[in-house]
């Protein structure tokens, strides 16, 4: 079924389709409409939806639900992740039970924010996957995939919509809500759930050992795709990939394009593209995360690329 949806509503639909049982959040543009949409449906859908007193509490509510085997999501704007950073960073070590998605909506150009910090930095800091949607359809699709990735690797997964994705409207293909599993069950396991140094050290090693598998899984995602037309190339992430596609089409230019939608970025995907171009322009919103990665890979795969 197709519906004309706001990006944030597409994310909310994805949460319902994934069968999440708990959604918590703290309001802040550009993320607020996710909980706004879900709250009136909570009783009908059998989902616990709440505005928490702050982002840290919202994060901990979602963590608690996840540890009972319930899929959960937490929503906030980018600066809210500062408030929630303590439990977020430690959760990467302790891991999840049911899939858990952390939705941190960034605000390039400070439309309604005090800074332009980039949530992708937090994902890299915590060593967890981050999905960067370019439009409302990708926002819905990535939400569904994020829950599956979270359960596959036992870590939270970040969804990072930006303002023009959260507040754009588009025709979105949606499905029906997934039936939730049996009631929540909490299993006492101090070695995995109590963040003492004696537990954290081996869990850190475990997290590091997951990184190769995470990168290999993300490498195969359709959101990382390229078209090679000439030796002049553009590498763009998130909604910047749409901007690049429109610009190239408008100029009727023979320009190669690699679109990036997932982090950590695949060395192979970027390296293979760099070997086919002699000049490259990187386009992304906010911090030069893709640019820094491209520079690093270029030294190995194509040192002469401009």
Question: Model-flagged regions — what are they?
Answer:
Residues 1-8, 12, 18, 133-306:
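Flexible, low-complexity linker and terminal segments
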Residues 1-136, 164, 226-228, 254, ...:
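Thiamine diphosphate
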């Amino acid at each position: 079924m197709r519906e004309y949806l706001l990006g944030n509503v597409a994310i909310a639909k994805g949460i319902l389709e994934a069968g999440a049982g708990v959604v918590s959040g703290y309001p802040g543009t550009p993320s607020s409409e996710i909980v706004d949409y879900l709250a009136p449906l909570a009783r009908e859908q059998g989902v616990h939806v709440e505005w928490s007193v702050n982002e840290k509490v919202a994060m901990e509510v979602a963590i608690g639900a996840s540890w009972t085997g319930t899929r959960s999501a937490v929503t906030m704007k980018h600066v809210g992740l500062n408030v929630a950073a303590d439990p977020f960073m430690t959760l990467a070590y302790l891991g999840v039970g049911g899939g858990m998605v952390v939705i941190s909506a960034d605000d390039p150009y400070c439309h309604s924010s005090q800074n332009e910090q980039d949530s992708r930095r937090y994902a890299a800091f915590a060593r967890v996957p981050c999905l960067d949607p370019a439009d409302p359809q990708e926002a819905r699709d990535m939400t569904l995939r994020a829950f599956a990735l979270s359960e596959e690797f036992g870590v939270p997964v970040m969804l990072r919509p930006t303002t023009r994705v959260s507040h754009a409207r588009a025709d979105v293909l949606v499905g029906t809500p997934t039936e939730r599993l049996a009631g929540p069950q909490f299993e006492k396991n101090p070695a995995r759930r109590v963040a003492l140094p004696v537990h954290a050290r081996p869990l850190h090693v475990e997290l590091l050992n997951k990184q190769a598998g995470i990168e290999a899984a993300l490498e195969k995602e359709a959101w990382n795709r390229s078209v090679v037309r000439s030796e002049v190339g553009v590498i763009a992430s998130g909604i910047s990939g749409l901007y690049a596609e429109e610009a190239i089409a408008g100029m009727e230019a023979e320009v190669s394009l690699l679109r990036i939608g997932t982090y950590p970025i695949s060395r192979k995907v970027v390296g293979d593209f760099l070997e086919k171009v002699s000049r490259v322009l990187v386009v992304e919103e906010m911090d030069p995360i893709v640019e820094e990665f491209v520079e690093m890979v270029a030294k190995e795969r194509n040192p002469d690329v401009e």
